[in-house]
A protein has these predicted regions:
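Mid-chain, well-packed structural core segment of small domains
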Residues: 107-141
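Immediate flanking context of iron-sulfur cluster ligation sites
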Residues: 47-55, 87-104, 134-160
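Short hydrophobic targeting helices and cationic amphipathic motifs
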Residues: 3, 24-25
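Local cysteine-cluster metal-coordination motifs and their immediate loop/turn environment
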Residues: 56-68, 97-113, 154-172
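Long, hydrophobic N-terminal alpha-helical segment
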Residues: 32-83
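Short cysteine/histidine-rich zinc-coordinating motifs and their immediately flanking basic loops
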Residues: 71-75, 112-117, 171-176
């Protein structure tokens, strides 16, 4: 499983965005675990790919500046940000997502900091008036995150104990 994850991340890095999206769809739509596959499927009745996103990552991406756990993680996060900004749809997902795939806390699809980040996710959902499993455009989501959390100075209430908090405090949100 570990080797499959490494190969998956290496495959991601050598694929162009359009090829990656096809790879992504095959990777998740063809999953054996249908409950997990449902989180990654195309939107109802369309061929448009809907990318799962942990709600708290809407805040992480607002302040992301190329720092992170490793060079591989930051390259992956930067590429995911580009993909999301192309107008993709997301499905709010309180579990590991594609950003998590390059994180050292991801162990076989489960986050070692699972309880803490699930609290972050649920707090973002609550403050934004959204629900787990909800599908929307990334831009709609970031607008809610900016208006309901970041502009209201509520970020620290949600994730002030995050190890990356100082990065967020140093700069302005890219969603502003």
């Amino acid at each position: 499983q570990f080797l499959a994850g490494v190969c998956s991340r290496l495959s991601f890095r050598i694929l162009s965005r359009s090829h990656w999206l096809m790879f992504y769809q095959e990777r998740y739509v063809n999953m054996q675990d249908k409950s997990s596959a449902a989180a990654y499927a195309s939107d109802e009745g369309t061929e448009e790919i809907v990318i799962p996103l942990r709600p708290h990552h809407g805040m992480c991406l607002a302040y992301f500046k190329g720092e992170g756990y490793s060079n591989g993680f930051t390259a992956h996060m930067a590429e995911m940000l580009k993909i999301f900004l192309e107008g993709k749809k997301i499905r709010l997902h309180v579990d590991t997502d594609e950003i998590c795939s390059a994180c050292p806390n991801n162990r076989g699809g489960h986050c070692e900091a699972g309880d803490k980040v699930a609290e972050y996710d649920n707090a973002v959902l609550k403050k934004c008036g959204l629900n787990a499993g909800q599908t929307l455009h990334f831009s709609e989501f970031t607008k809610k995150v900016q208006e309901k959390i970041l502009a209201m100075d509520k970020r620290k209430e949600i994730c002030g104990n995050c190890q990356w908090n100082s990065i967020c405090e140093e700069q302005k949100s890219r969603w502003a």
